[in-house]
Amino acid sequence: MGCSWRKTLSFFLVFVPIYLHGASSQEAAPVGPRKPFFERLRRLEEQFRRFQEVTWTHLQNIASNYNVSYNVDVRFRSLAEESQAVAQAVNRSQASVQGELAQLKAWVRKLQRRGRKVDTRLRALDLTLGERSQQRARERKAHKAQRDALQDSLARLEGLVHSQGARLAALEGRLPVAHPGTAALGPALVPTPTQPEELGPTSLKLQRDRQELRAASEHRGPPQDSSAPLQGRREPPASGSHRVLSGTAPKDPRQQAWSPQVPGEICGVGPTLVFPNASTRNVVFLSPGFVTALRALSFCSWVRTASGRLGTLLSYATEDNDNKLVLHGRDSLLPGSIHFVIGDPAFRELPLQLLLDGQWHHICVIWTSTQGRYWLHVDRRLVATGSRFREGYEIPPGGSLVLGQEQDSVGGGFDSSEAFVGSMSGLAIWDRALVPGEVANLAIGKEFPTGAILTLANAALAGGFVQGANCTCLERCP
């Protein structure tokens, strides 16, 4: 822009003198006609004015263009400065980013090293845990095998113990007839030193039972008829007969003084419940029931029925099943038969025709989830047994446990055709399987097995016509 303006100004300065020189030379020419000359001069003046105007306009355009170019240059310089500042800022930020990246790379390298160490430790832990889990699995398998073997051995041992107990009971029933005196009982039951025998766990238990039977025979009076009911000979309590349920089973049987009673009497067995008729109002609750799950059960009681059939002795119901544990008989069943139910609909039919004679009898129903074995003892004698009945089952806690009625709902739904009519005494429940020696001692009133979880001391009358009494002897109960 500056160069073009300078060229135009130079051209104007050169052209004006030349033009003025030409005009002066024309004036010095010979005088001719004056009009054409003035006209030409006016035209030249007009041309000059137009030229001046054009030149002025052109100069103004040049000046304006110069100003614009100057402003553009200023802007370009400012932009260049700004771009330079931006470049410097970018350089500074790039430097800081590079520094941060270097720090991050250092941290990443540290984390990678730590990660490799952690991976190494994790692999070592995995190997250790794998070895331990395998070892624990092997130990669990070994423990399971040992437990199964122990359960099998225990089941076989229980079967042997109960069979030996039944044989001992049968022998005891025959011995008074075969040997009138008590002096012959010792050699007949206990092996002499000249007859050594290998004493395993079963033999030791058998020998103890024989010694107990021998000791019991020393207190027996003249031999009685073997067909008579078995008598309990417990020392009668000091108080007389009264209609309350405050009596309990002996807390510590070793502190009780046992002495023979009159033959034919059953004494000192504890509280007695009398169910006079088949009313559905005749019900007794055992509280608090089962507080823990049961994998074994023993139910023992003295029972006397007043009708030609057996009703419900025991009923345990929960919210999901009203027949978790039942000992009941209906008037439609075979007289003297009773259904032993664990976890409806599984049941076994037990023969109890011996109880229909209107006399007192001692019964024990025993069950264990190990191989599902069960036993029924009546007056110390094993009358029924079996296996594979609810094997591995657990009787759940938290239900309603009643005597004398069969529950179709928790605590209700009674039916008079299933009601018990008669008397119960000395009732007790254990959370384990009693052995034959304990059953025999309980039946003869020699010793009360330890660990009972429920007795008639836990009974609560729910109205109706049920009567409670503490009788010195069962034969004197109403």
From Swiss-Prot:
Q: Where does Ca(2+) 2 bind?
A: E406, D408
> Where is this gene product found?
Secreted
User: What pairs make up the disulfide bonds?
Assistant: C300-C364
Glycosylation positions in this chain: N67, N91
Question: Gene3D superfamilies from the xrefs?
Answer: 2.60.120.200
Q: Where is this region: Disordered?
A: 208-262
Which annotated residues bind Ca(2+) 1? D322, N323, E406, Q407, D408
Check the record and name the Pfam families matching this protein: Pentaxin
Domain of life per record = Eukaryota
Compositionally skewed regions (Basic and acidic residues) per UniProt: 208-222
Which GO cellular component term is one of those annotated? extracellular region
Q: Does the keyword Phosphoprotein apply?
A: no
As cofactor, the record names: Ca(2+)
Provide this UniProt record's keywords sorted from A to Z. Calcium, Disulfide bond, Glycoprotein, Metal-binding, Secreted, Signal
What the record notes about the co-factor is: Binds 2 calcium ions per subunit.
The terms under GO molecular function for this entry are: metal ion binding
Tissue-specificity statement: Widely expressed at low levels with highest levels in small intestine, testis and brain. Very low expression in endothelial cells, monocytes, neutrophils and lymphocytes. Isoform 1 is not expressed in small intestine.
Induction description: Not induced by bacterial lipopolysaccharideS (LPS) or IL1/interleukin-1 in endothelium, monocytes or neutrophils. Not induced by PHA in lymphocytes.
**Quick one: signal sequence residues?**
1-25
Which positions fall inside the Pentraxin (PTX) domain?
A: 269-473
PANTHER family associated with the record: PENTRAXIN, PENTRAXIN-4
Write down what this protein is called: Pentraxin-4
Q: Taxonomic classification, please? A: Eukaryota, Metazoa, Chordata, Craniata, Vertebrata
Supply the gene name: PTX4
